[in-house]
C-alpha cells in the first residue's frame, strides 16, 4: 500500500513539473479575450472558460477586446462578476472598445481597471429594453384563437395573442426599473462616478468614444494596440515585445470561407437574438 501511494505521489509530481514551465511562462505574458457580437449564453460559456484559463495559467494581464451591442442581462452579469474575481486574483484587466461597445458591452467593460476606446467607437446605450409582440390582429385575420388556462393574472404576460393590460405594463416597468438600477449602480461603482452623474447620461443614448471620455466612461482614447501597451505597463511587462495570447477563440466553420458568409453570420446572430430575446429583459443597443 505504501509503495502504491509513493508511486501516485511521484506521478503527480511529474505532472506538476510538466505543466510548471507553462505556468511560469504565462506569468510574463498577456492574455487576450474577445467579446464579439451579441452577448448570449454561448458568449458567456466561451468567455468564462477563457477567464478560468487566464486564472489557472496566472497571466498577469488581460486585454479584453469588446465589439458588442450588448445582449442578455444574466450573461452580462456573470461575465462582469468573473472579471472582478480575476482582478482580485491580481490580474490587471484593460478593456478595448472596438467599433461598438454598448449596453451590455459597457456593463462588461466597466469591470476592467482601465477602458480604452477609439474616438469614433459607438458606446453608451446604458438602459434596459423589454419587447413583446402583439399579434392579436394577425391571428384574428387568419382565424387563430387561443384558449389559456393560468394560475394567476400575470402568468401569460407578453402573450402574443393579446395586448398588454395596464396592470401588466406597470409590473413590467417595475422589472425594468430594477434592472436599470442595477446597471447604473455598477457603472457608477466601476467608473468611480456619482450615481446621479451616471443617471444624467444613462437614458439609452449612444455617444462616441470621445464623448464617453469626457463623461468619465472611458479612460483613454486609442486603438487596441494602445490598450495592449497600457495593460503591459500596469503589469510591468515589456510594452514593445509583449504579444497577447488569444484565448477562447470562436470556432470557425467551413461555411465561413464562402463569399457573403460574414453577412449571413451577422443576420443569423440578429435573428437568433430576436428569437431568444423576445420577452426577455435585455441590455442591448438596437439601432
Predicted feature locations:
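N-terminal organellar transit peptides
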Residues: 1-103, 108-118, 129-287
Amino acid at each position: 500500500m505504501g509503495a502504491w501511494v509513493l508511486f501516485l505521489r511521484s506521478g503527480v509530481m511529474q505532472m506538476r513539473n510538466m505543466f510548471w514551465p507553462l505556468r511560469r511562462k504565462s506569468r510574463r505574458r498577456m492574455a487576450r479575450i474577445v467579446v464579439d457580437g451579441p452577448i448570449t449564453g454561448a458568449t458567456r460559456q466561451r468567455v468564462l472558460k477563457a477567464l478560468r484559463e487566464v486564472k489557472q495559467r496566472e497571466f498577469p494581464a488581460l486585454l479584453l477586446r469588446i465589439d458588442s451591442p450588448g445582449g442578455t442581462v444574466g450573461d452580462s452579469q456573470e461575465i462582469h462578476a468573473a472579471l472582478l474575481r480575476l482582478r482580485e486574483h491580481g490580474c490587471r484587466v484593460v478593456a478595448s472598445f472596438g467599433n461598438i461597445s454598448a449596453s451590455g458591452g459597457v456593463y462588461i467593460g466597466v469591470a476592467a481597471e482601465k477602458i480604452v476606446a477609439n474616438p469614433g467607437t459607438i458606446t453608451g446605450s446604458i438602459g434596459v429594453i423589454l419587447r413583446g409582440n402583439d399579434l392579436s390582429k394577425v391571428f384574428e385575420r387568419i382565424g387563430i384563437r387561443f384558449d389559456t388556462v393560468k394560475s394567476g393574472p400575470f402568468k401569460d404576460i407578453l402573450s402574443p395573442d393579446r395586448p398588454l393590460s395596464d396592470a401588466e405594463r406597470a409590473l413590467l416597468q417595475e422589472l425594468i426599473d430594477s434592472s436599470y438600477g442595477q446597471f447604473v449602480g455598477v457603472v457608477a461603482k466601476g467608473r468611480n462616478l456619482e450615481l446621479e452623474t451616471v443617471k444624467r447620461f444613462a437614458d439609452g443614448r449612444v455617444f462616441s468614444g470621445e464623448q464617453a471620455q469626457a463623461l468619465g466612461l472611458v479612460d483613454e482614447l486609442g486603438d487596441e494596440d494602445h490598450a495592449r501597451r497600457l495593460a503591459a505597463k500596469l503589469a510591468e511587462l515589456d510594452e514593445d515585445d509583449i504579444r497577447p495570447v488569444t484565448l477562447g477563440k470562436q470556432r470557425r466553420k467551413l461555411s465561413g470561407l464562402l463569399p457573403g458568409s460574414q453577412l449571413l453570420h451577422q443576420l443569423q446572430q440578429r435573428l437568433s437574438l430576436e428569437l431568444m430575446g423576445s420577452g426577455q429583459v435585455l441590455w442591448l443597443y438596437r439601432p
